Amino acid sequence: MSGMATTSPVDGEGIRLAKRVAAQAGVSRRDAELLIENGAVRVDGVQQTLPQSRVLPHQRVEIEAGVKPQPVEPVTLLLYKPAGMPIDTAHELLVAANHHEPERAGRRFLPAHARGQRCMTPLETGASGLVAFTQEWRVERKLHEDAAFLEHEVMVDVAGPVSPEVLARLERSPARVSIGRQAEEQTGLRFALKGARPGQIAHICDGVNLRILAMRRIRIGRVPLAGLQPGQWRYLAPHERF
């Protein structure tokens, strides 16, 4: 359909996009909705992914060739949660603008990928680092059933030096602890802890009178934080397993 106008309809004007796509493509209303949800439809050159959005008669609707009307596959997203962000608001970062290296992802981001995501590996508000969100039942089951066996690698900066005696006491905790760097002002510790829970490392440090300055999770099981920056996310790759 011709027409270059970009005026958006107000509530109640025009028709539902799914109805327009169904008529234009000669498919069922459900298949039209699936085409839209899969990012195959543009209105006046702009991708639309909400079947209930409305279009006016003069607006140009384009349907990408070759896209099959099938349900959007569930995905797992890996987020670098910034320090200071509560875990119950971290899902707000799962938007296209924060996608790390989308050109290498092998798939296009769809709003459906961010809906219904469940956080399976929470972090304290003050901590930063890797958090896993998933829509996939197999991943959810793995992270739930094997939670006690999955090793979390966490980098922890503490105030001041850490003496050999304190390090020995840390090593008697459930975690494997080593010193990454040490200076008079602060020490960088590496914790490797299976079944880590929010607050557990802080409790271990409190027990030996160490004051935490920063804490960052860099690995869950076999999945690393990799090249993410705070606030960025990426897809769990097909070959990756926790």
Specify the residue positions occupied by each region the protein language model found.
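Short, charge-rich, low-complexity alpha-helical interaction segments
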Residues: 1-2
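Basic, flexible Lys/Arg- and Gly-enriched helix-loop patches that mediate nucleic-acid binding at interfaces
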Residues: 5-242
